[in-house]
C-alpha cells in the first residue's frame, strides 16, 4: 500500500538521485555533477520553508516525488499578492506509473502552495506530464520565455 509523507533530510540523498533520474528521462544533457548544488538548494530551502516535497512510499522505498518552491515577485493582475509556487521534481518510478500516485502528489503540493498563500502555480511540463497537469486544471501560457545567462 502506498503511503505519503513529507520529505525530510533523511530521504534527501534518494530524492536527489530520483531528481537526476527524472532529468535524464526528460533528455537533459549531463555536463556537470548536480548533486552538490541540489543538496545545497534543498537543504537551505527546506530549512527556510521555501521548498516542500511530498513523497510516495512503498514501505521504505520512495516511489514518487514532488516539489514546490515558493517565490515572490511584484504583484500583477493575475497574482495580486505576487506569491508563486514553482512546481518541480514530479517523478514516479516507472514500475508505479498509472496508479494515481502523481495526481495525489500533485494535489498535496498544490495544497501546500495554497496554504503558503500563493496566487498561482507554474510548471515547465515534460511531454509525459502535460496530460496530468491539464487534467488537473493547468492551462498553457504561450507568453513564457527564458534567456540563458552565460556565467563569466
Predicted segments with their positions:
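Conserved beta-strand in the GNAT
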Residues: 55, 61-70, 86, 91
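Conserved acetyl-CoA pyrophosphate-binding loop and the N-cap/start of the following alpha-helix
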Residues: 96, 100-108
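A short helix-loop-beta-strand connector motif used in the catalytic cores of GNAT acetyltransferases and
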Residues: 43-55, 86
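A short beta-loop-alpha structural element at the N-terminal edge
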Residues: 3-17
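Conserved acetyl-CoA binding element of GNAT-fold acetyltransferases
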Residues: 78-94, 143-146
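Conserved beta-strand-loop-alpha-helix junction that forms the acyl-donor binding cleft
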Residues: 121-131, 146-151
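Conserved GNAT-fold acetyl-CoA-binding loop/helix
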Residues: 20-42, 82
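Conserved GNAT acetyl-CoA-binding A-motif
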Residues: 106, 113-125
